[in-house]
Amino acid sequence: MTEVLWPSAVEKQALGLAARLARQGVRPGERVLLTGENSSSFVAALLALCHLDVSIVLAAPQLAADQLAHMTRTANVRWAVAGATADGIPLPGSAVLDLTAPAAPDPADPADPAAAGTIVLDRWESRADAVVMWSSGTTGAPKSVVKSGRAVLENSRVTAAHMGYTRDDVLAPLLPFSHQYGMSLLLIWWLTGCGLLVAPYRRLEPALTAIAESGATVVDGTPPTYHGMLTLFARNPAHLDGLRKVRMWCVGGAPLNRPLAERFRDATGQPLLDGYGMTETGNIALALPDLAEGCGRPLPGVEVRVRASDEDAGEGEVGEVEVRTPGRLEGYLRPDGSLAPYDEPWFRTRDLGRIDGNGVLHVYGRMNAVHRLGHTLYPEYLERRAEECGAPVKVVALDDERAGAVLVFFVQDAVHDERVWRGRLRACLASYERPNAVVTLPEFPVNRNGKVDVNALKELAAALLRGGGDGR
């Protein structure tokens, strides 16, 4: 039976967890690690920790023991609330609460704020280090990002209002709760008072069944998730019959390419609503059903500019996206756990994008410039150009002493071979933009966050070139 979580029911579980943690000695301001798979217990634990006014350190449950040890050491973690990974946490057993064994509220001490009848977020909202999250590290080493409660909650409120969520909605996040995107949706659910479906996001077929049974109205996922959906729709079109109540299909976590967007609209009759946000800034811009272009316009109170050659870019000109927002980070943690404040008014995203004549933000990906044959190229901008040929493309640039860079194009296509794609790319790219090698793959590798595993592709590219291959 598919279960939809409603705030009033989860609140009781959260108060029980809060009371149990308080009895163990958890105090306001202490750093508490929160890790675990998506579950009602994880949702309750997040609310309990907010209620206790602690500094929440979010960690993915798939992390190796040495990575968890690094996080707990850097963040000066005192306690942990965890699920199946509890045994691998480098803390005394008495400091770890098993997320899979929640307790009921203890009415013995009604004066204890943890035993109060409602979850209160006011104190946590005033905390400067309310959340410590690690950026995904898709293209480099992860950074420990410190966010205030005010930044996190206000961004959630603005997002909820912008998207038009109501108490009648049922949200279905097909992504991990232990990251910025997932946590944001949990807080939006709580603030809105709507329903929440906890679906098995790594197993799409049962997830689609749960969406249909629950009457979910808003679905969120990453591009690979929607690629998987389209495969299931093609195999069994009956899946679509149960999804008629979904009014918004939202996508984030990685750039949305045009072929995927067009295929999804063709299959469902509805657009994929792209969004743009970062761990450091929260949500920045979100597309809407009546403006399903690019990443939409910036949220109220969020300013976005595009800079090219140290000056503001012209309308439609591509450059680095910079953001000024109340939702930005307080700073990063130093190796000793102290805060290195981020004081710049504008946050440099290191993402490449443009703003069109309607004020819509278009983001192409990371701003990793390479120099090749006397030209400055941006691999992720080349990806968007190449995808006009009809399939998802990832471009890996490797250093080359003579040319400056060697370009390997990976194409997600299980039907056509490299020779076909060389011809297509030759027609849509300038000579200095064309690949040295083309590799077709039935599916791109993905990491634990559901994003394309760029490091795995780099290893494939390096191995190809070491072996003298050219992808033909």
Regions found by a protein language model. Give the residues of each.
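Conserved AMP-binding A3 loop
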Residues: 4-8, 130-157
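Conserved pre-ATP/AMP-binding loop-to-beta segment of ANL
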Residues: 108-134, 140-141, 164-170
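Conserved AMP-binding/adenylation subdomain of ANL enzymes
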Residues: 153-170, 178-218, 232
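Conserved ATP/PPi-binding loop(s) of AMP-dependent carboxylate-activating enzymes
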Residues: 297-301, 311-344, 375-377
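Conserved C-terminal "lid"/linker of ANL adenylate-forming enzymes
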Residues: 396, 408-410, 421-472
